[in-house]
């Protein structure tokens, strides 16, 4: 996987590589070059969520090995996140476990994570999103972006 990713790196614009590095750096809290259980716990706590050890272990098991920048980049470029993986990422913030999140909370998360969305970008991001009564239905959204059309509500 490392060779394939390095080959892709030479073809990517420097700006895109830099954006990917910044995204990885936000996740790699201890800056050791790998995403660890402690990194995931720290970033979750920054976002107001405290996952237990079982949840953290389950998240790390989704990766085929230690997650370094090259592996992170390969995953992002191949777009291989499964529907379940994406749903699980949203579920981390779903304290009511009702498969819905407050849309304002999602917008705040995006702003807090340094994505620098302006109002127009934020509006466009959620223009087609399944939002009813201020609640973002992440199961429907995930099915929509992955093209499964499944509705597991």
From Swiss-Prot:
Q: Which domain of life is it from?
A: Eukaryota
Any one Gene Ontology MF annotation carried by this entry is:
calcium ion binding
The reply on keyword NADP is no
Name the PROSITE patterns on file: EF_HAND_1 (PS00018), EF_HAND_2 (PS50222)
Q: Which GO terms describe its cellular component?
A: myosin complex
Where does the record place the modification Blocked amino end (Ala)? 1
By its UniProt entry, which InterPro entries does this protein fall under?
EF-hand-dom_pair (IPR011992), EF_Hand_1_Ca_BS (IPR018247), EF_hand_dom (IPR002048), Myosin_RLC (IPR050403)
Domain EF-hand spans what residues? 15-50, 81-116
Keywords of the record, alphabetical order, are: Calcium, Metal-binding, Motor protein, Muscle protein, Myosin, Repeat
Is Repeat there in the keyword field? yes
Ligand binding (Ca(2+)) = 28, 30, 32, 39
One Pfam family assigned to this protein is EF-hand_7
Functional summary from the UniProt entry: In molluscan muscle, calcium regulation is associated with myosin rather than with actin. Muscle myosin contains two types of light chains: the catalytic light chain, essential for ATPase activity, and the regulatory light chain, a calcium-binding protein responsible for Ca(2+) dependent binding and Ca(2+) dependent Mg-ATPase activity.
Q: Which PANTHER family match?
A: MYOSIN REGULATORY LIGHT CHAIN 2 (PTHR23049)
Q: What is this protein called?
A: Myosin regulatory light chain
Q: Which organism is it from?
A: Patinopecten sp. (Scallop)
